[in-house]
C-alpha cells in the first residue's frame, strides 16, 4: 500500500498510525542539509521494490471523490453540507469551501523535536511546508490545529487573564471625568468643633472680598489709583494694553471704605504718598552687611534680617534684594564672588557636582595664575644697563672662555663632579654678582649630528646650570654639570657683546648658536681692568674646566 511506501521513504510518513515515530538526529536538522550517504543508502534499499503498484494506487486515489478518499484513510466527513454537495462540485471548489487548515508549524516542530530540544535548533519552516487539509490527510490521521483556532485560543487566554485579575475591558478604559456630576459635594460649615479638636483662637482679618463689586469696576479702580500715585511701571503696563496687576493695599482700602470707590481712592492716595515718603535709603554699612549675609545665608531673608541687617524688616530686605539685583553694585558683587553660581553652597540637595568643580577650578586657576605672573614678572632693566649689555664684543667673550678652559680626561667619568671645593685663597675684590631671575636647561643634541649647545628659549640663566647631556660617542656616560659664576667689572662690560661663543670641552669645540643672552645687572662699581683676574679665575679639578664663584 501507499502507506507503507510513504512510511519507509519519507520522514513525514513516520507519523502514520502503522509506523513508529521517527526522531531525526541533530546532524540532519541543525545544518539544514541532506546527508548524501543517507540518500544513497535509501536508494540501495529501494532498488528491489516495484513502484508500479504505488503509481497505480495514486492514480486511483486521484480520481476518487473526496469523501471516499477521507473514508478510505479513516476520516469521517465533519461538515455534512460539504458531503452532501460533493457530488455536484469539483474537488477544487471543495478545497475552497473547506476551512483554513494550515498546519501550526511550531506545534509540528515541538512534536518532532521533543526529545532533542537542547541539541537541535531548527525552525518549523525548514521541516514542513504550508499545506491544506486535503493534502495532509494522507500523512496525518489525527486532527491538527489551524491558525484561526490558535488565534482564538490566544484571545481567550487574554480574556481569562483579565477576568482573573478582576478588571473587565470596560473597567480598564480611561475616561476623563469632567462635569458637574463628578464634582465633590462639600457640606456646609456648621461652625462647631468636635470634642477632640482645638478651638482656633487667633483673630483673622479680612483683606478683600471679590464678590461684592464687579470685576470691571475693580479694574477701573486699580487703574485710577495707579494714575493718581504716579506708579510708572503700572502706567507703562496700562499704555501697553496688558492686564492690570492687583494692588493689595488698594484693594484693602476699598474693603475698609465699604466698597466706596471715590473714598477708597482718596484714602489710598494719602496713605500711598506717606508710605513712599517713609521709605529711607539704605546706608553703605547696611548694603555691605546685606551682601555679606547673602554670602553666608543665601536667600534666607529671615536669617539675613536676624543676624546682619537688624535695622530693616524682612519685607524691606526682600524689596531691596530685587532693586539691588538691577544695580551695578550687584554686577560687581557677582563678579567678585560668583554669587550667581554658588546656589549649591546654600542648597546641599543639589547634585550638580560638575558645575561646582568647574567653578572651583576656575577660581583656583585665576588665583594661581595671578600669583605666578606677579612672582615671575622680571623687573624692568634700565636703559643704562641695556647699553652696557649691548657693548659686548665677540673677541672679549672668546678671550674670556679660552683663558679659563682646560683639558678634561675623557676616561675619568667623575671628572665633572657636583662637589666643587670652595676657592679659599683666590684673591677677590669688591664685586656685584649678576642677579638670577630664572633657570633654563642647556641640552646637547642626542643624535650626534652637530657638536653644539642649543638654547631653546630666551631668558635669564642661573649661574649653576642644570644637568646637560654632552655630545660624545659614549652615549651611556652619566650627565655632568658645569658650574659657572661670572663677576664682571664695568670696564669689561662696556666693551663686550655677544655674537658667537665657542667653548672647548673634552677636546670638542662646542658652539652656542641661536642664543640670546640677557644679564640683569643691578649695579657695577668703579673697577679697573687690572682687577679682572680677581673676579674671573679658573679652578682645575681632575684636569677639567670648571668655573666656580661664590
Curated annotation (Swiss-Prot):
UniProt source species: Macaca fascicularis (Crab-eating macaque)
Residue ranges, annotated region (Disordered): 1-60, 113-170
Purpose: Transcriptional repressor.
Protein name from the UniProt record: Mesoderm induction early response protein 3
Biased composition (Acidic residues): 154-163
Stored PROSITE patterns: ELM2, SANT
Domain SANT: 277-329
Disulfide cysteine pairs (residue numbers): none
GO cellular component: nucleoplasm
Highest taxon in the source lineage: Eukaryota
Domain ELM2, chain residue ranges per copy: 174-272
GO molecular function, one term: histone deacetylase binding
InterPro entries assigned to the protein according to its UniProt record, in alphabetical order: ELM2_dom (IPR000949), Homeodomain-like_sf (IPR009057), MIER/MTA (IPR040138), MIER1/3_C (IPR045787), SANT/Myb (IPR001005), SANT_dom (IPR017884)
SMART domains, alphabetized: ELM2, SANT
Residue ranges, compositional bias (Polar residues): 121-134
Positions with biased composition (Low complexity): 1-16
GO BP, sorted A to Z: negative regulation of transcription by RNA polymerase II
Keywords: Nucleus, Phosphoprotein, Repressor, Transcription, Transcription regulation
Comp. bias (Basic and acidic residues): 17-36
UniProt gene name: MIER3
Xref: Pfam families: ELM2, MIER1_3_C, Myb_DNA-binding
Phosphoserine PTM sites in chain numbering: 52-53, 114, 156, 165, 168
Amino acid at each position: 500500500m501507499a502507506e507503507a511506501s510513504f512510511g519507509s521513504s519519507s520522514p513525514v510518513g513516520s507519523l502514520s498510525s502503522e509506523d513508529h515515530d521517527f526522531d531525526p538526529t541533530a546532524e540532519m536538522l541543525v545544518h539544514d542539509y541532506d546527508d548524501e550517504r543517507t540518500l544513497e543508502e535509501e536508494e540501495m534499499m529501494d532498488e528491489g521494490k516495484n513502484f508500479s503498484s504505488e503509481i497505480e494506487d495514486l492514480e486511483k486515489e486521484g480520481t476518487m471523490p473526496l469523501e471516499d478518499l477521507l473514508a478510505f484513510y479513516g476520516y469521517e466527513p465533519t461538515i455534512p453540507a460539504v458531503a452532501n454537495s460533493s457530488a455536484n462540485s469539483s474537488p477544487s471548489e471543495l478545497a475552497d469551501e473547506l476551512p483554513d487548515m494550515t498546519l501550526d508549524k511550531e506545534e509540528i516542530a515541538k512534536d518532532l523535536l521533543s526529545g532533542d530540544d537542547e541539541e537541535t535548533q531548527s525552525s518549523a519552516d525548514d521541516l514542513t511546508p504550508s499545506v491544506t487539509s486535503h493534502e495532509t490527510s494522507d500523512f496525518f490521521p489525527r486532527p491538527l490545529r489551524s491558525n484561526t483556532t490558535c488565534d482564538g485560543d490566544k484571545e481567550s487566554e487574554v480574556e481569562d487573564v483579565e477576568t482573573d485579575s478582576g478588571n473587565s475591558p470596560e473597567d480598564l478604559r480611561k475616561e476623563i471625568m469632567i462635569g458637574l456630576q463628578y464634582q465633590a459635594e462639600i457640606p456646609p460649615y456648621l461652625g462647631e468643633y468636635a470634642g477632640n479638636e482645638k478651638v482656633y483662637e487667633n483673630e483673622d482679618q479680612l483683606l478683600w472680598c471679590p464678590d461684592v463689586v464687579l470685576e470691571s469696576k475693580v479694574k477701573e479702580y486699580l487703574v485710577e489709583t495707579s494714575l493718581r500715585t504716579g506708579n510708572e511701571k503700572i502706567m507703562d503696563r496700562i499704555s501697553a494694553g496688558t492686564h492690570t496687576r492687583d494692588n493689595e493695599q488698594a484693594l484693602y482700602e476699598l474693603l475698609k471704605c465699604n466698597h466706596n470707590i471715590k473714598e477708597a481712592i482718596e484714602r489710598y492716595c494719602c496713605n500711598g504718598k506717606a508710605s513712599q515718603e517713609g521709605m529711607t535709603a539704605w546706608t553703605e554699612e547696611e548694603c555691605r552687611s546685606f551682601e555679606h549675609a547673602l554670602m553666608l545665608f543665601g536667600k534666607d531673608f529671615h536669617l539675613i534680617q536676624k543676624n546682619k541687617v537688624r535695622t530693616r524688616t524682612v519685607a524691606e530686605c526682600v524689596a531691596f534684594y530685587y532693586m539691588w539685583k538691577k544695580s551695578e553694585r550687584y554686577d560687581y558683587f557677582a563678579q567678585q564672588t560668583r554669587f550667581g553660581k554658588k546656589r549649591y553652597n546654600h542648597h546641599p540637595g543639589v547634585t550638580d557636582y560638575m558645575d561646582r568643580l568647574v567653578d572651583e577650578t576656575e577660581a583656583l586657576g585665576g588665583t594661581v595664575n595671578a600669583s605666578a605672573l606677579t612672582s615671575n614678572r622680571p623687573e624692568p632693566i634700565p636703559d643704562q644697563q641695556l647699553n652696557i649689555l649691548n657693548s659686548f664684543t665677540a673677541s672679549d667673550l672668546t678671550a674670556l672662555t679660552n683663558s679659563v678652559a682646560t683639558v678634561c680626561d675623557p676616561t675619568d667619568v667623575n671628572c665633572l663632579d657636583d662637589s666643587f671645593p670652595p676657592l679659599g685663597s683666590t684673591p677677590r675684590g669688591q664685586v656685584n654678582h649678576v642677579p638670577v631671575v630664572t633657570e633654563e636647561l642647556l641640552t646637547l643634541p642626542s643624535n650626534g649630528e652637530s657638536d653644539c649647545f642649543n638654547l631653546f628659549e630666551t631668558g635669564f640663566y642661573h649661574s649653576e646650570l642644570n644637568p646637560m647631556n654632552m655630545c660624545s660617542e659614549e652615549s651611556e656616560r652619566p650627565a655632568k654639570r658645569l658650574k659657572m659664576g661670572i663677576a664682571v667689572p664695568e670696564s669689561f662690560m662696556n666693551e663686550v657683546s655677544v655674537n658667537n661663543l665657542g667653548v672647548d670641552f673634552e677636546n670638542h669645540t662646542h658652539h652656542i648658536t641661536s642664543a640670546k643672552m640677557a644679564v640683569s645687572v643691578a649695579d657695577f662699581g668703579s673697577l679697573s681692568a687690572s682687577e679682572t683676574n680677581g673676579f674671573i679665575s679658573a679652578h682645575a679639578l681632575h684636569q677639567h674646566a670648571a668655573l666656580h664663584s661664590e
